[in-house]
A protein has these predicted regions:
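Extended, aromatic/histidine-rich regions of cofactor-dependent oxidoreductases associated
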Residues: 2-75, 128-222
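Mid-length scaffold segments of soluble, non-membrane domains
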Residues: 97-150
């Protein structure tokens, strides 16, 4: 009788283990363990417009993702300005009016993404430091050595943003934290990320990283 009970318990244990294994296998097979959304709270619809996901913006970088610490970060505005200024991350966010607008980034690789950007106007920053009348261009420098130039008139006339949020979320490191230039109507290589320095210049022919490697300085989408 004792042996019978023991065998019964053993059989039940084997059956339970088999059932558990089957449930695990079915869960894997039918995808019950859903992949984690990296950006679970991002805005995907704004004023009736469907937005791309932050994940749709590819991580194109010359030296990989840059990880900048806001406690030591400084944005320097220099060159042909009335005064050279270094701003902390918190100073930028508190000092300048924040704006939002939907802008689509187009890459020369063929992909695009429509994103809700939030940031400050380049124009407001330039007004704060004062610009020399001889300045015609603005060179943006990044922490990884990347650079690109845009005409001063383009930045002023088109309300160009330097963004710190996309789709309602703080820009993640792989997308350019703390600041990315929203160079609307320009191809993606003008959308510089990880900006650390903004330089006013009287040289309209400065060649940035990709421009010095054959990309046209005029990146206007036609």
């Amino acid at each position: 009788m004792e042996n019978f009970k023991r065998r019964k318990v053993q059989v039940l244990a084997v059956v339970l283990v088999a059932m558990l294994a089957a449930l695990v296998a079915l869960g894997i097979y039918f995808g019950q363990t859903a992949p984690r959304n990296l950006y679970p709270t991002e805005v995907r619809d704004y004023q009736g417009q469907n937005l791309s996901s932050i994940a749709d913006v590819r991580e194109n970088a010359i030296k990989g993702t840059q990880f900048l610490n806001t406690s030591t970060y400084r944005l320097t505005v220099t060159g042909l300005v009335n005064r050279t200024v270094e701003y902390t991350y918190d100073q930028i966010l508190s000092k300048f009016q924040s704006y939002q607008k939907i802008v689509t980034i187009f890459c020369v690789e063929g992909w695009s993404a429509k994103i809700l950007w939030q940031g400050f106007l380049v124009n407001d920053l330039l007004n704060d430091v004062g610009v020399n009348t001889s300045a015609v261009g603005v060179i943006f420098h990044a922490s990884d050595g990347y650079s690109t130039e845009l005409p001063l008139s383009y930045l002023r006339d088109n309300n160009i943003l330097v963004a710190y949020k996309m789709n309602g979320l703080t820009i993640p490191p792989e997308r350019g934290f703390p600041f990315e230039l929203v160079a609307e109507s320009q191809y993606g290589y003008k959308w510089i990320k990880w900006i650390t320095q903004i330089e006013l210049t009287d040289n309209p022919d400065y060649l940035g990283f990709w421009e010095s490697r054959g990309y046209p300085n005029n990146a206007t989408i036609r």
